Curated annotation (Swiss-Prot):
Enzyme Commission code(s) on record: 5.1.1.1
Binding site for substrate: R137, M318
Species this protein is from: Halalkalibacterium halodurans (strain ATCC BAA-125 / DSM 18197 / FERM 7344 / JCM 9153 / C-125) (Bacillus halodurans)
Pfam families linked to this entry: Ala_racemase_C, Ala_racemase_N
Active site feature: K40 (proton acceptor), Y269 (proton acceptor)
Protein name: Alanine racemase
Gene name of the record: alr
Keywords, alphabetical: Isomerase, Pyridoxal phosphate
Domain of life assignment: Bacteria
GO CC terms in record: cytosol
UniProt modified residues of type N6-(pyridoxal phosphate)lysine: K40
Amino acid sequence: MEHFYRDTWVEVDLDAIEQNVTNALRLYKDREMNLMAVVKANGYGHGAVEVSQAALRAGASYLSVAFLDEALALRKAGIDAPILVMGLVGAEHVQLAIKHRITLTVYQLDWLEQAISRLHTRDKLAIHLKLDTGMGRIGLRRKEDIRSCMDFIASHECFELEGVFTHFATADEKDLTYFKKQCQRFNQWLEYIREWQLPIRYVHCGNSAAGLRFPEKNFNMFRFGIAMYGLTPSPEITDELPFPLKQAFSLKSRLSNVKKLPKGEGISYGATYVTEGAEWIGTLPIGYADGWIRHHSNAGGHVLIDGKRAPFVGRICMDQCMIRLPKKHSIGDTVTLIGESDGKQITMDEVAKRLNTINYEIPCVISWRVPRIYFRDGQIISVKNNLL
């Protein structure tokens, strides 16, 4: 087991990952459904390898990532499950994808033409065709472009059209007008694609929001991303979720210094905070280089220590920050920045709200200077320290 030597760390509850996957699949117990675990961005900052293993253990049958390097990292770690790269992979890398059994996303005729020149007669490249039904990001948008790609795929046996998919832009909102428009487009284009009579194994359109809110809108696969980590796709639909999500990510630190300062003393760079009386000030060994950005300095944020809230004071430094303690504490006492402490909780949603962002971003930006500790059944099963 790896070790780490700093007093700031992330705890990842793999039981939470597995519980969220299990509960999601139960929604589809009466019909065939494949759950694709989305582990891009290093598993949303949780750790792609460990999250993949937990998700597969709980019943996921497919993994997805953003780019080829992420897929290769999973293969290097010994993960054998099917992997879809959802972003663009250069056509020059198709042999690498075939060698490592990695499925690629296709949405350009030019790409298909470039790829075929690099494929051999007996090669089989698994692909998923991406349709842009309203996200405006990547994907085929016009019927004539779909026709051109389908004609090319159908006439070259090197391509195995394993799947067709799209992505919803507003499935996590109360207003479903645009969502329904995308559903309609996808159904129409899917019907058109079926005219080529190719054996398409997977059809997927649902993300976490659509997969949990609208099981009837999903085909035989949905992509389980943010909710797998126990985070709601958006606060406005929390009351519509079919089961409570269990947050897997906690961020903790230990006091590295404690001092009592008199009234009128400045704290941190610029002395932007001045003590209002005699105050106990604690220092934490975490800063913006760890992803705990400077905006925490003036956003009204707190930590938990012994279940009590303590506010940040002064500017966040590169490697350290300061808090105002409710009483005298000892160096080495544990402080919770995200997670639970003595029955109290600071959620990812709370942190995101004070930073005027979304919960997705928070774990993703906690840098890999911060080691990850993985728990199952309340016991540490592994430690990941990317610095050593």
